[in-house]
């Protein structure tokens, strides 16, 4: 068992906060993220304060929502913690572990340092972490593919029904 604080570094988001909240829908711009269900709030053309350090987990300190991020971004809220892996820790593994715990809170307080960092988790060796993370990622890819196929079948059915009852 190891404490979460021994697996992850955290960074305050201050230098990555978006200044203009008049977001664009142009996906060629930099996404502005939140850790809650909406995830991408919109896009910004701000060329400063962009998080560009690679993979991270964004953690909402109030709601305890988490998202795995592997692209450039900015954030909207100072309640976001940006988490990165310490040496010999697979970030995706820790993300999946924390996701499995279904963290949530109804209290409007900061949780990461007081509740999450001291939490103990099972941490296998790095090779096993990577194997588990890759396996779970392949399942995510399969789910995404099946969902896209499902949506295509729905569209095909709608097309057939529209042409059947003309």
Please provide the spans of the model-predicted regions.
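Alpha-helix initiation and N-capping motif
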Residues: 1, 91, 157-158
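Non-catalytic DNA-recognition/assembly elements of restriction-modification systems
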Residues: 1-37
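Basic, amphipathic alpha-helical recognition segments used for DNA target recognition
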Residues: 4-6, 64-123
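Hydrophobic aliphatic residues
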Residues: 8-11, 98, 164
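Short, surface-exposed loop/turn microsegments at beta-strand edges and helix-strand junctions
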Residues: 21-32, 45-77, 98, 108-114
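Short, glycine-/Ser/Thr-/acidic-enriched flexible segments
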Residues: 38-39, 64
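Short, solvent-exposed loop/turn elements at domain surfaces
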Residues: 41-43
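Amphipathic alpha-helical coiled-coil/heptad-repeat segments
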Residues: 122-166
């Amino acid at each position: 068992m190891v404490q979460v604080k021994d697996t992850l570094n955290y960074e305050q988001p201050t230098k990555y906060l978006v200044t203009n909240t008049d977001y664009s829908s142009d996906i060629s711009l930099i996404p502005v993220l939140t850790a809650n269900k909406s995830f991408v709030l919109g896009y910004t053309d701000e060329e400063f304060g962009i998080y560009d350090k690679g993979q991270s987990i964004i953690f909402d300190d109030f709601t305890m929502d988490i998202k795995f991020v592997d692209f450039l971004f900015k954030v909207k809220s100072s309640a976001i913690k940006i988490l990165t892996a310490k040496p010999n820790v697979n970030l995706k593994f820790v993300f999946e572990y924390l996701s499995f715990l279904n963290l949530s809170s109804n209290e409007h307080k900061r949780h990461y340092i007081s509740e999450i960092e001291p939490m103990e988790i099972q941490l296998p060796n790095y090779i096993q972490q990577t194997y588990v993370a890759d396996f779970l990622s392949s399942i995510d890819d399969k789910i995404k593919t099946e969902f896209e196929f499902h949506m295509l079948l729905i569209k095909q059915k709608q097309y057939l029904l529209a042409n059947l009852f003309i």
